[in-house]
């Protein structure tokens, strides 16, 4: 189906366009598309920046730009740097709501509403350019240009991956990924529109949301990533989605075999992995077999520098810096070239080590690297709920010993990490990548502070925080080496520092009153901390609770100068 045929067919469709908080038919969507397209044409808009949380609004804005001949620019996020980029590049900013921080015209979705559409309203389509940001391996944003015809061709290629048995059920397409990136754009937006499948409007970024939302529809497809799919556990109410999920599509990294097995057993039999990049589009897929299969339009060559690919969708040859081993029935990915390192004359694939440890029931996510200040390996590990329980029960040394032994079954001693850091979650971005600065800090800096999950000022004299105890707290070492708990003196240190951060305390308190430690504070505990200030009596009371259990409480007497200043 050409882009013109696709457009003509959808313009006549009576089917559902999107669903979620509210549903839209294709006819309703076409009315909004035509109205926005007319606005863009009337105002001679040549370049539009698009940033949306609502998938329906995004799709409408994209199609309106196609009709109006307006090129599209997709920021990966709304950082200050990207805001400046938009201001210097585009004529208008299209989003769910007006952004008053941008110094360019902004048009919210509420301004596009139109109630009627007829075939006579349909305009010619234009092969507009769509610009996406990608960080690649450097962490610095690059601009990648696609055009509308290429995006339609990508959708056509991808449609062949889904079995007819999946498509015939007309499943609703659910996504945990962002439409601001190539993966979300291709699969959530283009593929669903190409196949005429209804798209769920909201992004579902937690496993619980995917499960609950799946139950609301007869059949669904999940568009997700290993980052989220690796978090599924038996502790989730898996039964909610049973019988509702027709297929799971995953991209952005390798899906660990244990997670694939879990999905096959509890979610659905069709688990489809996609390999590619923003530059190349989708390159290969893997479904129910050990090896990857190239898409039909891909021509390729393998060298020591990686995998070079070219296609109708990527006419300039692109080098993917991944080590590849060809087999008779496909190929295997060994990981990025820069993630195959040499230690003591031994070639070691860091991805292979990660994949092996991902099989362990204690490991939810992992990143292994050569230590920034040494010649040995370091591992940054996010533990599963089971792993956290064992951490609290047995301690850090036992966890490391068990993971090393698990890895040693198939790896030489030189490949076993000597430096370990543990956490509850690795801070991956929407493309499943880690910021190199975060990795460096995690490996080199001791963990001494709590994680502030949320905070707000309730009133002028009451402040609330929700904090989490880090797994790998430096203060667990020594006296609390086996049974990890936060010493009382450290709890008080945190309280004073948090009061200083919210500007309630500058100097050291004069004294402490009515101090009580009632329950242990342990690794990964999430607690609420409430400060109440009495300026007349020159005191700040604090109470730390976990659910209904009191952990710590007391009062600080503050200097005269601070109570007067407040």
Residue ranges of each PLM-predicted region?
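Gly/Ser/Thr-rich phosphate-binding loop
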Residues: 235-290, 301
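Conserved AMP-binding A3 loop
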Residues: 25, 129-156
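Conserved AMP-binding/adenylate-forming core of the ANL superfamily
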Residues: 5, 13-42, 146-149
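Conserved C-terminal "lid"/linker of ANL adenylate-forming enzymes
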Residues: 341, 403-451, 562
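Conserved pre-ATP/AMP-binding loop-to-beta segment of ANL
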Residues: 8-12, 110-133, 165-173
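Conserved AMP-binding/adenylate-forming
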Residues: 38-78, 170-179
């Amino acid at each position: 189906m050409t882009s013109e045929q696709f457009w003509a067919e959808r313009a006549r469709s009576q089917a559902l366009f999107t669903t979620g908080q509210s549903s839209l038919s294709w006819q309703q969507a076409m009315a909004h598309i035509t109205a926005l397209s007319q606005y863009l044409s009337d105002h001679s808009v040549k370049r539009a920046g698009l940033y949306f949380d609502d998938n329906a609004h995004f799709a409408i804005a994209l199609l309106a730009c196609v009709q109006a001949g307006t090129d599209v620019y997709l920021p990966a996020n709304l950082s200050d740097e990207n805001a400046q980029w938009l201001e210097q590049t585009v004529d208008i900013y299209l989003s769910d709501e007006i952004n008053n921080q941008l110094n360019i015209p902004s048009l919210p979705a509420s301004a596009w509403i139109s109630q009627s559409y007829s075939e006579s309203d349909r305009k010619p389509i234009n092969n507009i350019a769509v610009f996406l940001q990608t960080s690649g391996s450097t962490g610095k944003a690059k601009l990648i240009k696609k055009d509308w015809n290429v995006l339609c061709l990508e959708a056509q290629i991808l449609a062949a991956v889904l079995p007819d048995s999946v498509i015939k059920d007309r499943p609703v397409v659910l996504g945990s990924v962002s439409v601001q990136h190539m993966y979300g754009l291709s699969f959530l937006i283009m593929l669903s529109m190409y196949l005429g499948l209804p798209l769920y409007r909201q992004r579902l970024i937690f496993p619980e949301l995917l499960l609950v939302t799946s139950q609301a529809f007869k059949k669904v497809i999940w568009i997700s990533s290993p980052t989220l799919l690796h978090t599924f556990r038996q502790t989730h109410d898996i039964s909610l989605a049973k019988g509702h999920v027709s297929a799971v599509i995953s991209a952005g990294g390798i899906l660990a075999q244990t997670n694939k097995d879990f999905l096959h057993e509890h979610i659905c039999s069709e688990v489809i992995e996609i390999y590619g990049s923003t530059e190349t589009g989708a390159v290969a897929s893997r479904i129910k077999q050990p090896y990857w299969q190239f898409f039909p339009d891909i021509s390729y060559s393998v060298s020591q520098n990686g995998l070079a690919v070219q296609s109708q969708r990527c006419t300039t040859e692109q080098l993917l810096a991944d080590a590849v081993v060809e087999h008779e029935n496909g190929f295997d990915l060994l990981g990025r070239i820069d993630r195959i390192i040499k230690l003591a004359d031994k070639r070691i694939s860091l991805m292979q080590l990660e994949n092996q440890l991902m099989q362990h029931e204690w490991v939810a996510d992992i990143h292994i690297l050569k230590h920034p200040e040494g010649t040995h390996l370091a591992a940054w590990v996010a533990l599963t709920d089971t792993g956290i329980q064992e951490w609290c029960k047995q301690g850090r040394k036992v966890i490391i010993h068990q993971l090393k032994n698990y890895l040693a079954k198939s790896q030489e001693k030189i490949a076993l990490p000597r430096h370990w850091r543990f956490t509850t979650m690795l801070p991956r971005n929407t493309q499943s990548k880690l910021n190199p600065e975060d990795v460096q800090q995690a490996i080199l800096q001791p963990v001494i502070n709590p994680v502030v999950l949320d905070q707000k000022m309730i009133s002028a004299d009451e402040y609330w925080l929700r904090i989490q105890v880090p797994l790998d707290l430096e203060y667990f070492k020594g006296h609390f080496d086996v049974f990890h708990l936060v010493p009382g003196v450290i709890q008080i240190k945190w309280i004073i520092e948090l009061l200083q951060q919210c500007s309630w305390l500058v100097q050291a308190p004069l004294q402490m009153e009515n101090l009580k430690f009632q329950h242990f504070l342990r690794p990964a505990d999430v607690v609420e901390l409430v400060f109440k200030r009495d300026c007349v009596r020159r005191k700040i009371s604090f109470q730390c609770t976990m659910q209904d259990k009191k952990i710590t409480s007391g009062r600080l007497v503050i200097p005269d100068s601070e109570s007067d200043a407040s």
